[in-house]
């Protein structure tokens, strides 16, 4: 009997050539930062810094499946989805969001992983006609040199980025709404599942620490 594998897929849009998928990569904050609820890069007990996010997967199999499929990935913060949903509920005409990230340890050539993500909506095309598929999601994966900023962060060093793969998916209003709505509801359900226990455990620990300090 084949094992029933647990899938982390939240929502998916698929045609005969393209795929857009959102996946569960949410992680609770450590108890020391319980009020964050979502992990935001705080150091965990094992020394690793974790981030709570929603995975984005785009695939282009217009040239074939298997080795011919182009697959790209990126991550979005949990707050992105209720933000977009609220904008969509206010009769959104245009939307423009871009985000570039560089992370991971450099390889033997000094290059780290780069993701470039773009989510845009344009109700009218360049020809002035209404667009049937006004939403466009673009993800690009590549490599670049990671450079530290004056404030201690990191960014892509100018002139070092090398694109490896890129996929775009055009989506109509209803299908994009379903993607965003289902993902937003999942995030809310996740928060209601993990949040209460995290808060209770933190409050209990805080009370114990205060009681010990008064002895």
Positions of the model-derived regions?
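Short, low-complexity cationic-aromatic patches
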Residues: 45-50, 74-76, 128-130, 166-177
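Short, well-structured alpha-helical interface segments that form or flank functional binding sites
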Residues: 51, 68-71, 75-90, 178
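Acidic, metal/cofactor-coordinating or nucleic-acid-engaging core segments within structured domains
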Residues: 79-112
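N-terminal "first-domain core" detector
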Residues: 1-69
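Mixed-charge, glycine-accented linear interaction segment located at domain edges/termini
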Residues: 144-215
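Eukaryotic short linear interaction motifs
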Residues: 63-65, 93, 145-146
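A cross-kingdom feature marking solvent-exposed beta-strand/loop segments within repeated
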Residues: 58-77, 154-169
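Short, solvent-exposed interaction modules
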Residues: 90, 105-163
């Amino acid at each position: 009997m084949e094992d029933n594998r647990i899938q982390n897929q939240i929502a998916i849009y698929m045609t005969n050539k393209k795929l857009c998928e959102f996946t569960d990569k949410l992680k609770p904050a450590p108890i020391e930062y319980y009020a964050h609820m979502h992990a935001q890069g705080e150091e965990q007990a094992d020394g690793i810094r974790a981030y709570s996010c929603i995975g984005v997967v785009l695939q282009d199999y217009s040239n074939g499946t298997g080795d011919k499929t182009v697959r790209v990935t990126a991550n979005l913060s949990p707050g992105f989805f209720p933000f977009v949903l609220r904008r969509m509920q206010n009769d959104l005409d245009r939307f423009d969001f871009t985000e570039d990230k560089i992370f991971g340890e450099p390889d033997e050539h000094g290059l780290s992983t780069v993701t470039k993500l773009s989510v845009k909506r344009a109700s009218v095309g360049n020809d002035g006609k209404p667009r049937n598929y006004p939403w466009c999601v673009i993800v690009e994966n590549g490599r670049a040199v990671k450079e530290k900023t004056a404030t201690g962060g990191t960014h892509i060093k100018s002139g070092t980025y090398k694109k490896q793969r890129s996929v775009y998916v055009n989506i109509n209003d209803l299908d994009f709404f379903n993607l965003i709505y289902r993902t937003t509801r999942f995030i809310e359900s996740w928060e209601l599942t993990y949040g209460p226990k995290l808060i209770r455990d933190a409050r209990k620990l805080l009370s114990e620490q205060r009681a010990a300090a008064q002895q």
